[in-house]
UniProtKB/Swiss-Prot annotation, chains A, B:
Keyword NADP (UniProt): yes
Gene Ontology biological-process entries: amino acid biosynthetic process; aromatic amino acid family biosynthetic process; chorismate biosynthetic process; shikimate metabolic process
Known catalytic reactions: shikimate + NADP(+) = 3-dehydroshikimate + NADPH + H(+)
Keyword annotations of the record: Amino-acid biosynthesis, Aromatic amino acid biosynthesis, NADP, Oxidoreductase
EC category: oxidoreductase
Species, as recorded: Psychrobacter cryohalolentis (strain ATCC BAA-1226 / DSM 17306 / VKM B-2378 / K5)
Quaternary structure and interacting proteins, as annotated: Homodimer.
This protein's pathway: Metabolic intermediate biosynthesis; chorismate biosynthesis; chorismate from D-erythrose 4-phosphate and phosphoenolpyruvate: step 4/7
Cellular compartments per GO CC: cytosol
Residues at the catalytic site: K68
Positions of NADP(+) binding: E83, G141, A142, G143, G144, A145, N165, R166, T167, V168, S169, K170, M232, G254
Stored HAMAP family: Shikimate_DH_AroE
Protein name, per record: Shikimate dehydrogenase (NADP(+))
Length: 288, 288
């Protein structure tokens, strides 16, 4: 029997998820149908579209911009949230809470939310062989993308964490909120800076801003160094990566994070682990 | 495998369709799940909700106020419309055009629209034993409800048809549009009147207005008589029926039409005919 999945967003035509998950389905030998699902940008429409999908017998949904926070609210009021989703304050993966279904709770009341973005980043770095355990890490950006990776990074054993943002107060607020939301995070001292003041040596620096979209560049000082530089963006020239590659750092864009988070969602839905290295190679052949 | 259905409307909490179709499923021995589906009142939300439902593997959807015209537009641009839906200019039943699916057309492009409201009325009258063949029929009202029953009545062999409306011009416009939309209707001369001017003897008079909701009464003259009076409304006191029952007419409200249109939708989706008399009795036991 075909298992049905969607990725819901607005806009959505550009999403690569259908091709990625269709390849996963082939790799896992499962009959799946994964499609893009447009939705008007309001909470009532999102809830209605998600309800209709799960009413129809859908198995799982990915959630992308602008619905990750709305999905969070939806699940918080129904079937619950994973710890990563709770701390991230956002959901990118929807499924049905099987325990609740078994108790006869209707599908739409059993909606459960997870967030695999952060773990997808960590898994990609580990595949790259970057030394997360004991690492001195800096994240540039204090929005949703940054929020989603802090806990997974801490769980991966990093030593120290700094968060920098154009306006430092936003970074401070993020740290306060995260420390309240998670005891694990609360045990870490997280330094905060204005981006222009971030300096010194780090093992890993992560660009969690969408500045790559606008062609602007980050105000990075020359006194800022790292061994590894990661930009969550992909599919375009990334000045952030160039800045550090000419200074001898190893760099990576976020395409592997995209595959990583997708593989984790797929596993969440089907219980089947994906050989991400093999899938990435296969996808690169598809997309070139 | 569970077959999934929804009724989509706004508001929708009041809909009786889930109970009706669940009973049909039991009667037909099919594993079905039929649920109410709220949707924000705009075309983009409706299209997104319907797409998500069929993406999820949904089999069929009923459409009620305020989406019947939007559903019509949706299907006209995709998998097509039945003749009844085309002439009614509205869709109450959505399914997937199997011929298109077989050609690899994706579900959302194979969306097919039917309208079973009018035939549901005709079938109910025939169950009541009312003599449609050769009947002189009058319809009061010139909105969507009236529009949906003209072709089925003509196909049932009525002799003459008059359409009355508070403002007669609306009835005239309806007749013009219907005659253009259907050759069968075009061959009939349909008289039009202001409701207050409708008089003489009819076999059947149908109230296709929603005046029953507001508690107002229709401006019916004493020179208007009929053997059978039908009000499409149900579930409340209906002054229209009282007006004619005290004048010796046989009367019926529209509950049987609701069951009739549902049975036709069910048959459209599953290929299984429903024993409507048996179902109606069973439902009356459920609802009392």
């Amino acid at each position: 029997m075909t298992q049905h999945f969607i990725v819901i967003g607005n806009p959505i035509a550009h999403s690569k998820s259908p091709e990625i998950h269709t390849l996963f389905g082939t790799q896992a030998g499962l009959d799946i149908c994964y499609q893009r699902q447009y939705c008007p940008d309001d909470a009532a429409s999102f809830t209605a579209v998600i309800e209709a999908f799960f009413h129809g017998g859908g198995v799982g949904a990915n959630v992308t911009v602008p619905f990750k926070q709305i999905a969070y609210e939806c699940c918080a009021a129904r079937g619950g949230l994973s710890e990563h989703a709770k701390v991230a304050g956002a959901v990118n993966t929807l499924l049905l809470n099987k325990a609740l279904l078994a108790k006869g709770v209707p599908p739409v009341e059993a909606l459960f939310g997870d967030n695999t973005d952060g773990q997808g980043l960590v898994n990609h770095m580990q595949r790259l062989g970057w030394p997360l355990n004991g690492a001195r890490v800096a994240i540039i950006g204090a929005g949703g993308a940054a929020r989603g990776v802090v806990l997974p990074l801490i769980e991966a054993g990093i030593e120290t964490l700094s968060i920098a943002n154009r306006t430092v107060s936003k970074a401070e607020i993020l740290v306060d909120e995260l420390s309240t939301a998670s005891e694990k995070i609360n045990q870490h001292t997280i330094q905060t800076y204005a981006t222009a003041d971030l300096s010194g040596d780090f093992d890993i620096i992560i660009n969690a801003t969408s500045i790559g979209l606008s062609g602007e560049t980050l105000p990075l000082t020359d006194k800022l160094n790292c061994q590894y530089a990661y930009d969550m963006m992909y599919g375009r020239e990334l000045p952030f990566l160039q800045h550090f590659s000419i200074r001898g750092a190893q760099t990576s864009d976020g395409y592997g994070m995209l595959i990583g988070q997708a593989a984790l969602s797929f596993e969440r839905w089907t219980g089947r682990a994906i050989d991400v290295a093999q899938a990435t190679t296969a996808l690169e052949n598809v997309s070139t």
